[in-house]
């Protein structure tokens, strides 16, 4: 499994940027995507995929320790849908 440092190193290797500059780029990408999603906007990268938010309905759950029924409130969660090129590359 690759982590953030692995991603930064690969970006540096592929672009010729320093690791410090690559880290800034990776961090900026994450921040920008987060800002768009927080405003309720989608981020579509053709061929790669789409970052979006989805509404999760309220539901009933259980406390695993007591078995007591609890209500879980509706919420908005981030989601990613892979694009065709990414799906094909992973096959």
From Swiss-Prot:
Record-level Gene Ontology MF annotations: DNA binding; structural constituent of chromatin
Domain of life where this protein originates: Bacteria
Record CDD domains: HU (cd13831)
Record has ATP-binding as a keyword: no
An example Gene Ontology CC term for this record: cytosol
SMART domains linked: BHL
Biological processes, Gene Ontology terms: chromosome condensation
The keyword ATP-binding belongs to this UniProt entry's keyword annotation: no
Primary role: Histone-like DNA-binding protein which is capable of wrapping DNA to stabilize it, and thus to prevent its denaturation under extreme environmental conditions.
Record's subunit section: Homodimer.
Stated name of the protein: DNA-binding protein HU
Encoding gene (name): hup
């Amino acid at each position: 499994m690759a982590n953030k440092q692995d991603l930064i190193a690969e970006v540096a290797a592929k672009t010729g940027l320093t690791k410090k500059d690559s880290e800034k780029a990776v961090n900026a990408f994450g921040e920008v995507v987060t800002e768009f999603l927080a405003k309720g906007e989608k981020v579509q990268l053709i061929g790669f995929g789409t970052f979006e938010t989805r509404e999760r309905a309220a539901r009933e759950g259980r406390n695993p320790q007591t078995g007591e029924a609890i209500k879980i409130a509706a919420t908005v969660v981030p989601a990613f849908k892979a694009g065709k090129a990414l799906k094909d590359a992973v096959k």
